[in-house]
Amino acid sequence: MKFDTVIMGGGLAGLLCGLQLQQHGLRCAIVTRGQSALHFSSGSLDLLSALPDGQPVTDITAGLDALCRQAPEHPYSRLGAQKVLTLAQQAQTLLNASGAQLYGDVQQAHQRVTPLGTLRSTWLSSPEVPVWPLSAQRICVVGVSGLLDFQAHLAAASLRQRDLNVETAEIDLPELDVLRDNPTEFRAVNIARLLDNEEKWPLLYDALSPIATNCDMIIMPACFGLANDTLWRWLNERLPCALTLLPTLPPSVLGIRLHNQLQRQFVRQGGIWMPGDEVKKVTCRRGTVSEIWTRNHADIPLRPRFAVLASGSFFSSGLVAEREGIREPILGLDVQQTATRAEWYQQHFFDPQPWQQFGVVTDDAFRPSLAGNTVENLYAIGSVLAGFDPIAEGCGGGVCAVSALQAAHHIAERAGEQQ
């Protein structure tokens, strides 16, 4: 099977890369093993929240300039501030075209409210998510009886520290009792599958309506809206106060929705989606990828002109930690890591951890190296890259988006030259 590009990994980076390549008229396939990290995320995307020295970032342009000085090997630093902003804006356009109407500005970070009621600087958020400063003084944090993925009293306690009048309440929906037989089934995603049925909408409205008459804003867990935000908009039009949603413990409704929107758009535009499959071997000849072998296709290889590695970091097994060191399991690419295992981590848990910055070594075009030699038609994007800390620096989503589009543009340019 011949393709212009085969992408190994179906997370945020892989999907955005595929969508951008389709804009250039290239035929793409994505090989994906299972759920991506988006399923376990908040559904919001960070661009740059803090510098390596811990300084918080509000002005993105100034932050990127400072990042270039502090961390010259960071993926953003390789591109330069203006290029990062341009690619981030293009990524936002791609997301919106896929139906993910995310709110945000590449020039200025905003503060979203987290499930614990604290604030986190971010780039893009779903319109349902409350953004600081809140537009209300009287707030009610509403939980769902029996839902363990969201603790209303914890969120309320944090918000009260910001001089807000915050109460808590709990709604009980007997229609959800079918899920209560097994506590592990009473999760936000399973609740959403029931509540997204249009016949159930009035039941949720009836439960929230008495609470809404006594406050200016309701904050509740995101336990509906797996496919779209239609129910949220329907409720906001009818309730006498604003309704906002907070992501829950994983799996996340908002994260799953974002992934599904991107995946459906990729397939709609003619992309080949290979779910439940796994790349077992990649054949390289004369410094280029020639064949990709997958578990499901056995002796039928995929033959791409270009290949993209978007396999993620440790969470997605894109990187594997072993006693002797860190390795990239598909091709055995060169990995940036510390000299000894003792240097992988810091003693204090909440300090920035060195292992977060481990990843494959690439050139400035994000082409990785194998035994010191660049693989000419292979690109590495997203969390598998080295040189950044997605947690401490708050840049995970941004690095995925920016590196994906940079690789896609580079591939499209080279593909045009080869025709």
Curated annotation (Swiss-Prot):
Keywords tagged on the record: Cell inner membrane, Cell membrane, Flavoprotein, FMN, Membrane, Oxidoreductase
Main localization (coarse): membrane
- Role of this protein: Conversion of glycerol 3-phosphate to dihydroxyacetone. Uses fumarate or nitrate as electron acceptor.
Q: Which reaction does it catalyse?
A: a quinone + sn-glycerol 3-phosphate = dihydroxyacetone phosphate + a quinol
Q: How does it sit in the membrane?
A: Peripheral membrane protein
Q: Name one GO cellular component term.
A: plasma membrane
GO molecular function annotation = glycerol-3-phosphate dehydrogenase (quinone) activity
Q: What class of enzyme is it?
A: oxidoreductase
The record's annotation in InterPro entries points to:
FAD-dep_OxRdtase_2_FAD-bd (IPR003953), FAD-oxidoreductase_2 (IPR050315), FAD/NAD-bd_sf (IPR036188), G3P_DH_GlpB_su (IPR009158)
What's the name of the protein? Answer: Anaerobic glycerol-3-phosphate dehydrogenase subunit B
EC number(s) on record?
A: 1.1.5.3
Single GO BP term = glycerol catabolic process
Gene3D superfamilies annotated for this entry?
FAD/NAD(P)-binding domain
Q: Which family does it belong to?
A: Belongs to the anaerobic G-3-P dehydrogenase subunit B family.
Named cofactor requirement(s): FMN
